[in-house]
Amino acid sequence: VEAVAGILPHPVDMAELQQVASRAIAEATGAEAGFVTGCTSAGIVISVAACMTGLDLAAIERLPDTGGLKDEVVIQKGHVVNYGSLITGDIRLSGARVVEFGAALETGAYQLEAALGEKTAAAVYVVSHHAAPTGMISLPHFAEICHARGVPVIVDAAAEYGWRGFVEAGADLLLFSAQKALGGLTAGVVAGRRDLVRAAHAQSRGIGRPMKA
């Protein structure tokens, strides 16, 4: 509270602030880079968008029109959680098409392999007490299969208080809730591979504009 009160009266260069935040997030998560966004839900939208567009500004400005882009996002049926809204709704906000696979309480690796295709842009993995408690593919195995097909893995860990271990388990992009973990104002944290973090942050040139912090 004292830190917030101390900085509020002063003007801040937001780009510089995000650079400082990136270093702090990288240190806290073990990721290469990171930034702060409006909330974790926003983080899902712009992370999916990043996996579809990369740093292509024309594609970024065109979303949610995904013509010519890989635009499918796979997710285990047992990970289709509702945290006030369905996670699949946030994925679709980017313009992506959701591909659910497996059953509510049981998913096999062969089903993930079958769900991945030429149009797959990303795979979403949820770590939460809201997700199916058993029967899901483990994150390391999930990531191994996706990476073998060149598909990045987005991990929604908004329900978690610990931020370590996800990069080592195979996450390419990580999403956390700042207010849950830090007790601060509503905000989301995006962390991960530097190239994907840059692409996610660049979504402020398009659909991510109303989601920036």
Regions found by a protein language model. Name each.
Residues 1-22:
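A glycine-/small-polar-enriched, mobile loop at the entrance of the PLP active site in fold-type I
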Residues 1, 22-25, 30-36, 41-213:
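Conserved PLP-enzyme active-site core in the AAT-like
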